[in-house]
Amino acid sequence: PDPILGGSQFPAQIASEYQKLFADAGVHLVTGHRVSSVRKHENAEVALDDGIILEADDVVAGLGATPVTNLAEDAGLTVDNGVVVDEYLRTDDPAIWAAGDIANYPDSVLGRTRVEHVDNATMMGKAAGRSMAGSDTPYTHTPMMYSQVFGVRWEAVGALDASLQTTSVEVGD
């Protein structure tokens, strides 16, 4: 767990500003811990990995995602951080395609990757459909990520990783 919200994705200055947006809006963030359990009483009780119990009106947990690949594995498909596909989004079975959050695909900028975001899922789903219909156009879309929090919008292209060189551009009113 990151000690600051978005600390492993954003450069330190941007992560600090992002966390401040939540704090300024009255959101109490608990970072650097994992949730070990949540119980419902009159309010929610959240137990953290260090034994601290928090009471809350509501709980929002950012847990990340692990692709569920059992069906692909049972079908004998290659699985490595998702279902492995080629540039046409075909698996190693030529009658099966995969797209979206579960697909591990070759990207010209990022290398072989799997992306969990609506932009990639939408573009990849359309490309897989075209490929199934006979198109011989490879999937070449490099994904973008975006979000809007408390009136502040951010966008990123490529990998979100705080260790990478990042360019930040602020757009005024």
Please state what every model-predicted region is.
Residues 42-47, 53-127:
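FAD-site-proximal beta/loop scaffold in flavoenzymes
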Residues 28, 78, 153:
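Residue-level detector of anion-binding/catalytic polar loops
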Residues 34, 51-52, 94, 152:
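Well-ordered beta-strand scaffold positions
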Residues 19, 51, 88-89, 146:
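Short secondary-structure boundary/capping segments
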Residues 35-38, 83, 89, 173:
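A structural signal for short hydrophobic beta-strand segments in well-ordered beta-sheet cores
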Residues 1-37, 121, 141-149:
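Rossmann-like dinucleotide-binding cores of NAD(P)H-dependent redox enzymes
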Residues 24, 36-45, 49:
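Conserved N-terminal Rossmann-fold NAD(P) cofactor-binding segment
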Residues 102-173:
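Mid-to-C-terminal Rossmann-like scaffold of FAD/NAD(P)H-dependent oxidoreductases
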